[in-house]
């Protein structure tokens, strides 16, 4: 299954050299925030990151490849959390997050994963 994570492009590019990816809020939250659905990713992005300027990227994460524990902390199971660093080989695609003329994030494009 593919899950989604949004990150400022510049910050992600700085993380590539590290053994695992850790977003800025990880030190405080203890996990990496993700969403299960593309439309939900856009909703969350607009709720929390709309005011952030600069380019952002969507990370497409294959849950079968993630080495850290993944846990759903909500009853609806829409928000998977990765409890640990994200190994880079679990990121199967990176796409520039697009915005509409009003600055709202658009959902990430669907991605077909073949085994």
Model-identified regions with their sequence ranges:
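Conserved, structured core segments of small domains
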Residues: 1-115
């Amino acid at each position: 299954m593919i899950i989604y994570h949004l990150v400022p492009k510049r910050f992600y590019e700085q993380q590539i050299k590290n053994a695992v990816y850790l977003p800025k809020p990880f030190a405080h939250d203890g996990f990496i925030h993700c969403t299960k659905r593309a439309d939900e990713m856009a909703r969350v992005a607009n709720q929390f990151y709309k005011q952030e300027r600069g380019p952002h990227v969507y990370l497409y994460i294959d849950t079968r490849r993630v080495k850290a524990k993944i846990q759903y902390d909500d009853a609806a199971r829409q928000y998977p959390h990765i409890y640990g660093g994200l190994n880079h080989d679990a990121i199967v695609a990176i796409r520039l997050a697009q915005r509409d003329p009003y600055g709202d994030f658009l959902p990430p494009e669907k991605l077909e994963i073949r085994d």
